[in-house]
Amino acid sequence: MVVELKNIEKIYENGFHALKGVDLELKKGDILGVIGYSGAGKSTLIRLINCLERPSSGEVLVNGVNLLQLKPKELQKARQKIGMIFQHFNLLSAKNVFENVAFALEIAQWEKNKIKSRVHELLELVGLEDKMHFYPKQLSGGQKQRVAIARSLANYPNLLLCDEATSALDSKTTHSILTLLRDIQKKLDLSVVFITHEIEVVKELCNQMCVISNGKIVERGLVEEIFANPKHAVTKELIGIKNEHADKKSQNVYRIVFLGEHLDEPIISNLIRRFKIDVSIISGNIEELTTKDIGYLVVRFLGSIAETQRALEYLNALGLQVEKLKD
């Protein structure tokens, strides 16, 4: 495991209980989206991973090492394998792009003759070779975040922490940054933890997700599995799933989930032909995820109880997830 958090508790001096019994694992090569509403404990969680915050109790293991047991110099060395980017970039305004990236190498005591080539390599990676002499005030928000990404990768980390890294960006720039992160993750075989309150970020970037609410992890798993079958009320809210009805008198209303391989199949028309049943479509949409697409249909079955039951058994036999909505 690249990251293991074991039974983490975090209680601040004012008595606020930010994290409660948190257990979390991150495997090599995974991109984990940690999502929740403001105040849920997301930023506290990510700052514990590199010990910018220390837990009240529990264990923090990164690359198999318990960071809480390290001496200051040992912790500083361990942090070199953990990159981090922030919402507001945290660039040094008095230094240009080259110097901002080089600063991380200087702190790590790189030899001067190696710093120049490494900075050029990093700026090429993030597409800013032509901006190395620019200062932060001359850059757009997306360019500033690219500098921050380059700086975070300076010391060849195998873990990248992203704390609301796209929250200050518009949607077009967010997409370009997420595309860059996805490409870099593949190229460098990074493990990534991305804190966000935006479900679109999870959909576009992550293969794993965890939902945090009131200091607890309430749901954790593959992105497509959670989107297909969310369990917790907060997860359903974040994904945007509602109990949809045509009216209060509606009966036999179901939500059907179609995973990628079923999206192009005429399942509903086949069902109508096969059984003595009509199907009224109330709503539908498709979620485009990193790993696969997922389709949702909310429908009402119009037919006898026996034929409706046969239709449901048919859908289940195809491997579709079917949920009856409340009458």
Curated annotation (Swiss-Prot):
Residues 3-239 form the ABC transporter domain. Coiled coil: none annotated. One of its GO terms (molecular function) is ABC-type D-methionine transporter activity. Keywords: Amino-acid transport, ATP-binding, Cell inner membrane, Cell membrane, Membrane, Nucleotide-binding, Translocase, Transport. InterPro entries: AAA+_ATPase, ABC_transporter-like_ATP-bd, ABC_transporter-like_CS, ACT-like_dom_sf, MetN_ABC, MetN_ABC_transporter-like, NIL_domain, P-loop_NTPase. One of its GO terms (cellular component) is plasma membrane. It is a peripheral membrane protein. The keyword Nucleotide-binding applies. It catalyses: L-methionine(out) + ATP + H2O = L-methionine(in) + ADP + phosphate + H(+); D-methionine(out) + ATP + H2O = D-methionine(in) + ADP + phosphate + H(+). Its EC number is 7.4.2.11. Its main location: membrane. It is found in: Cell inner membrane. ATP binds at residues 36-43. The complex is composed of two ATP-binding proteins (MetN), two transmembrane proteins (MetI) and a solute-binding protein (MetQ). Belongs to the ABC transporter superfamily. Methionine importer (TC 3.A.1.24) family. Part of the ABC transporter complex MetNIQ involved in methionine import. Responsible for energy coupling to the transport system. This is Methionine import ATP-binding protein MetN. It comes from Helicobacter acinonychis (strain Sheeba).
